[in-house]
């Protein structure tokens, strides 16, 4: 596997570094900044799993650690404020740095703090879940939730580097592994059908090198899309396949019911059903999607939670992808994707949605 992918950004170019030696790669990334202060942002789960790693960080660097509770509740302005307090108390300057080490929540949270503290300080991402490695860490999106609305406050603020190590995945629970596969299937279904087919046939237990290749292929796809449309005006919108409904599910349901990748899987199924109903996607493609989700134990319906189509539709109206009058869905097609604009007052669509859930 190649060791580095270089991402071109209108904000700031950065490298994605693949390694089995996180400490050495981080030291190489820091360069002369080794002498500066570092704040490592992580969550309790990662901190306890890799406490010896954090102890090594403390020995080698002028390092501080901020440990968040696990889960999406940490993507909040209250947590941002707590991290600001620590940065101020330790007298962090614009030349000091944040290092996030955790899943998507930690990366989004730490990146948002980095983007806003002193109007921007450098940061490095070390994603530890499959989902964060192939999706949320790539592309510079950072942000937090606000009043129950997913990723309502945020920015595009690329890191100095992203360090990818599949060794972290050895401690990842199967449910979280499947959530990462969900995002890989998303990009494969829209942009890279050979990747989708490889994921359909992949045997995790016997093919570690195969997993590394699939991760690299997924990241390469997202890199290509982000470089062409960093600010989500066209092509990058395709990566929201499944996300209009998925984000609404996350807003209305407790995290225990549906994790991010699971909510997105349900969203993809509904988007694909809409596409089939409009003659945009062959029924066989929908069936293939359902089969691979079943193989990875990803949900395809809302049976775990009592959520109505009406309540989902109300949340749709606050989605950041929307135009002034329309709710935007991303529908897969036989050759790519298209957008579907639903009027915010179209209550007949609520009935249609209810029939698809």
Curated annotation (Swiss-Prot):
A GO CC term assigned to this protein in UniProt: cytoplasm
Key words of the record: Amino-acid biosynthesis, Aromatic amino acid biosynthesis, Cobalt, Cytoplasm, Lyase, Metal-binding, NAD, Nucleotide-binding, Zinc
Cofactor, free-text remark: Binds 1 divalent metal cation per subunit. Can use either Co(2+) or Zn(2+).
Reaction(s) catalysed (UniProt annotation): 7-phospho-2-dehydro-3-deoxy-D-arabino-heptonate = 3-dehydroquinate + phosphate
Stored CDD domains: DHQS (cd08195)
Pathway terms, separated by semicolons: Metabolic intermediate biosynthesis; chorismate biosynthesis; chorismate from D-erythrose 4-phosphate and phosphoenolpyruvate: step 2/7
Subcellular location: Cytoplasm
Superkingdom, taxonomy of origin: Bacteria
Positions with a binding annotation for NAD(+): 104-108, 128-129, 141, 168-171
Matches recorded under InterPro entries: Dehydroquinate_synthase, DHQ_synth_AroB, DHQ_synth_fam, DHQS/DOIS_N, DHQS_C
Record's function text: Catalyzes the conversion of 3-deoxy-D-arabino-heptulosonate 7-phosphate (DAHP) to dehydroquinate (DHQ).
Protein name: 3-dehydroquinate synthase
Species assigned in the record: Streptococcus pyogenes serotype M1
